[in-house]
Amino acid sequence: MRLDDEPENALVVSSSPKTVVASGNVKYKGVVQQQNGHWGAQIYADHKRIWLGTFKSADEAATAYDSASIKLRSFDANSHRNFPWSTITLNEPDFQNCYTTETVLNMIRDGSYQHKFRDFLRIRSQIVASINIGGPKQARGEVNQESDKCFSCTQLFQKELTPSDVGKLNRLVIPKKYAVKYMPFISADQSEKEEGEIVGSVEDVEVVFYDRAMRQWKFRYCYWKSSQSFVFTRGWNSFVKEKNLKEKDVIAFYTCDVPNNVKTLEGQRKNFLMIDVHCFSDNGSVVAEEVSMTVHDSSVQVKKTENLVSSMLEDKETKSEENKGGFMLFGVRIECP
């Protein structure tokens, strides 16, 4: 909980971050003990010190530092954490992708970060539990009879991955008939450099998809004149690695319409695109999801996860923090060994 602002110079030039030793000989980066007994949090980025606020405990200040480091030091966030990643904090990068760096820092300073992160997790788990995957013949906008809070995702097309799709070229070729019909319009009258880097008057777009876990994926979509193909480039390699994609796996693309009575994530439209993976099995078949399968009906685990998140993220700020053997992290009591 943030108590007050730094009196002066919230952003000043300095050389190296400070480390504080809290109770139990635990060292926290970016935490400064103050004369009034409270704890300040700060982080260094581009050789500048950014003030994050004042907190009641060193643990809260250290947590604020970890959250800020995700946005400011995403390239090596693992090297700058006070606490190990958990099943809860692993969702922070996705949450922060919805906001600018300035907005994330302001939320940390004004004390609203943890509340908005909690809301993000709850809304996302509710969306996952409401998705109804439909086949290509399902009518777009069809009303689900089981619940008006479910929304259907209609398949646009699918593609079996080739060796080059998951190889060193770091690109996915979209078949022309699907690219023209379903993807945003881009001009095919372009010149390009080697390795697909386009120069001159270029038209390429960033397309945004969500997977089944409602994690956002952004791909650069453009036209390669040399091979006369429509491709996903930037962002595709990360998706391949994260999903451990192999040759003959199938990628399916969907369009999803969200009813007005269902909340969406920050910045997410009521109509969005979804990307799903059907893995190729050892027996030579593709393990696909059943048509019209509702996720929350087929997966009790999703509901359990939603209940767990709600339980773990209950607001306990008014409760005592007298337990000397632990600390509070996003409303959860973490016991120290």
UniProtKB/Swiss-Prot annotation:
Its main location: nucleus. Gene3D superfamilies: AP2/ERF domain, DNA-binding pseudobarrel domain. One of its GO terms (cellular component) is nucleus. Keywords: Activator, DNA-binding, Ethylene signaling pathway, Nucleus, Transcription, Transcription regulation. GO terms for biological process: ethylene-activated signaling pathway. It is found in: Nucleus. The keyword Transcription regulation applies. Residues 27-84, 157-271 bind DNA. GO terms for molecular function: DNA binding; DNA-binding transcription factor activity. Coiled coil: none annotated. The keyword Transcription applies. Belongs to the AP2/ERF transcription factor family. RAV subfamily. Probably acts as a transcriptional activator. Binds to the GCC-box pathogenesis-related promoter element. May be involved in the regulation of gene expression by stress factors and by components of stress signal transduction pathways. This is AP2/ERF and B3 domain-containing transcription factor At1g50680. It comes from Arabidopsis thaliana (Mouse-ear cress).
